[in-house]
Amino acid sequence: MIYEDELRQMHALVDRARAAGVDAVIASDLSAILYARRIGMEVHISTQCNLTNSEAVKFFSQWADVVVLARELSLDQIGRIARAIDEQQICGPSGDPVRIEMFAHGALCMAVSGKCYLSLHETGCSANRGACRQICRRKYTLTDVETGAQLAAEGQYLLSPKDLCTIDFLDRFIGAGVRVLKIEGRARGAEYVLSLI
């Protein structure tokens, strides 16, 4: 999400990325997508766009050769989208079929991709603007407000699913049509990412 008074800052940031030799930007805000394309930068459509079907992929294909599908999709759903890309010849600006990018490792959000407001509500930092404070990954207890009784729950990480780890079924990811693998890096140190490669 980029607000009106942030457009110049976004332009300057994308300009600096291009000048530094960055290959592509990952974006969800249409202003960033359009500006990056206007200055000749490749765009990858972010998971924040919550792409869950081939019509959404077709819409964004006018600006991007790579789309990051929503993390909530099953392998079957990813496969159906990949087949639709092939069957309908959904191509990006390069003229090649759009490539599907998926997270191969990292945190799973307890909310729908691009729709979490917990961090904003609790800390004033919006996950939808790349500033998630991962409030969901803290330990919590579940209490019945009417009786005060603590309810039984497995573990204390009630809002935090286990991290995504696809190493044991990368072949199924690739078989479903995933062409680009993504490792979560935001809010992680370089050592974390290095240990996974």
Residue ranges and their predicted role:
Residues 65:
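Anion-binding and metal-coordination hotspots
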Residues 1-51, 55, 68, 76-78, ...:
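Active-site pocket-lining/capping segments in soluble small-molecule metabolic enzymes
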